[in-house]
Amino acid sequence: MVKFYTYSGETAAEALKIAQSHHGVDTLVFKTQEIRKKTLTSSGLYEIVVAVEEESENKPSKAPLIPESLYDEELNEEDVVMQLSSTVEEMRKLAGVSSSQRHYSFSKNKTLLEKDAPLEDAPLEANKQDALLQALKDEANHKKEREKREVKQEEEIKDINLQLSKIRDSLKLIQNMFWDEKNPNSINIPQEFAEIYKLAKQSGMKPSHLDEIMQLSLELMPLRMRENSVTIKRYFREVLRKMILCCPEDLNLRQKRILMLVGPTGVGKTTTLAKLAARYSRMLAKKYKVGIITLDNYRIGALEQLSWYANKMKMSIEAVIDAKDFAKEIEALEYCDFILVDTTGHSQYDKEKIAGLKEFIDGGYNIDVSLVLSVTTKYEDMKDIYDSFGVLGIDTLIFTKLDESRGLGNLFSLVHESQKPISYLSVGQEVPMDLKVATNEYLVDCMLDGFSNPNKEQA
């Protein structure tokens, strides 16, 4: 016999799913109707009536598919099929099935009924496919909407950043309204240059060099570039970059290279020499043979410090006293690619001891002399040191303790005035990592944006 069961859900599909969970996927849907429409405050409600064929205890024969209450004396098979067909049609409308997908006509329904095939299988399968397609379309539409919103948000953020930049420039102009700085030649420094002028002045740059840069900028910088602080700083950065000289590291050795480090006491010559030894022997693509000679026989612990580094790096080290011994050790280290010479630190005012170093340099060997200076030294003292050690024939400059200085204006001024190139920079105390080949770009960045250790940034 056939029994009828009623199930409800927020959607027709949900109600059908509940019915199928009780009676199986082949459940015959007899009727579907919308009880309550979905609103903003309440969910929809659909009711579905299913017909289930159950075995009767008294009647083993198959029960009719249509309830007896629906039979009429005039009701024939054609009317039953019509009623079932209209029920299926109503389900299609509720599930959103288009007319093009209605491929089960009245005649086909009749044929299926005659063959005892379940009428609901094909429409339900079509409903599932349509629901899946609709879900995919909805997801694609949602994705497009999200992308549009994200693009719009990015444009709004860019616009906000642009407005903030304009506000910052306006504030700087307001702050500099009372700016009345003049250089020694009574040339007014425009308000637009106030920020960069103060920054360069605080760095320790020689005033005459700074005024020279300002004068050059006023003459050459287009007016349209003075609109905001960013373009002014960019232009000033380029001027500074051209102001100093840096020499690239020369590793094309046709013969052994002898490098002597000279300079005052306490600038870090010995530590810098250890960094160079490690760099040449271990840190480059080619591992060069390195030997060390020290002339520092006066400072307590100097030889011990260098010997410790030399033993760690498995390289020879010799201490010499006079030019004759120096020549012998140079010959003994003939097999080396680099010979590094450490010297005793001398005051720039001790002309006699500085002149004593010249005996070693004038021994007939091609020696590159590097003056080691600390950027913590003010420009006036730095210039005195350079002038005093200049008698040795300075080839390059090495600057140390960049991590201990707040400004590099003194460095820029000395290099600009001496026209000597910078070879290396010591950016920290770690051996061997904190040694960097000097570049214009890095020095300008440190001066305008503050010091940064490239080794720690990479880590």
Curated annotation (Swiss-Prot):
Membrane topology annotation: Peripheral membrane protein
GO MF, one example: signal recognition particle binding
Keyword Membrane: yes
Cited Pfam families: SRP54 (PF00448)
Compartment(s): Cell membrane
InterPro entries named in the record: AAA+_ATPase, FlhF, FlhF__GTPase_dom, P-loop_NTPase, SRP54_GTPase_dom
One Gene Ontology term from the biological process aspect of the record: bacterial-type flagellum organization
Annotated GO CC locations: plasma membrane
Function: Necessary for flagellar biosynthesis. May be involved in translocation of the flagellum.
Name the UniProt record assigns to this protein: Flagellar biosynthesis protein FlhF
Taxon lineage: Bacteria, Pseudomonadati, Campylobacterota, Epsilonproteobacteria, Campylobacterales
